[in-house]
């Protein structure tokens, strides 16, 4: 069931890769979509941003666009906090303080003109990046239940700080 009241973005910021700049994106959000699936190992989101351009001061003191001013290239941290807007919804909070912020996986649909810019940020959880950059170089014992191997991979290789609930299995490999 859809909410009857619009969402309010308490926090929607992006931090440059060098950590020097943080930009509040709340005024430029056209749409925000959040995806969570029991069959997916990660949380993803998409946000469509529009800006009138020239909102960041660069090193020379000139005003430049968000895309060129941060610059947006991927890997930037995005913090989001959206309180629930109905009794059926839950708060969404992905912030550095909680250690579960999103990361920019890619920037698509980029349109930059003289006085405006539009782009889509494709966001992923930290586990998505770790999943792509980590290797498990171990053979797991065939005598142990699969659930034990899953727990070990998540905790020791993916280094997830999240509370992971793995159903116990009886079957070994």
Q: What is the predicted function of each stretch?
A:
Residues 1-135:
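Assembly/oligomerization scaffold segments
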Residues 113-173:
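Charged- and aromatic-enriched interaction segments used to assemble
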């Amino acid at each position: 069931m859809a909410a009857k009241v619009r969402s309010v973005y308490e926090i929607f910021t992006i931090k440059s890769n060098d950590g020097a700049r943080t930009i509040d994106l709340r005024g430029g959000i056209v749409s925000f979509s959040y995806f969570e699936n029991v069959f997916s190992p990660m949380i993803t989101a998409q946000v469509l941003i529009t800006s009138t351009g020239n909102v960041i001061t660069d090193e020379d003191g000139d005003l430049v666009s968000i895309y060129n001013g941060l610059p947006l290239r991927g890997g930037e941290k995005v913090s989001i906090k959206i309180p629930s807007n109905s009794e059926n919804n839950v708060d969404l909070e992905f912030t550095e303080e909680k250690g579960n912020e999103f990361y920019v996986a890619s920037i698509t649909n980029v349109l930059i003109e003289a006085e405006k810019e539009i782009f889509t940020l494709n966001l992923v959880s930290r586990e998505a990046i770790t999943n792509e950059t980590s290797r498990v170089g171990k053979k797991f014992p065939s005598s142990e239940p699969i659930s034990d191997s899953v727990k070990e991979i998540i905790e020791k290789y993916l280094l997830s700080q999240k509370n992971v609930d793995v159903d116990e299995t009886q079957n070994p490999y």
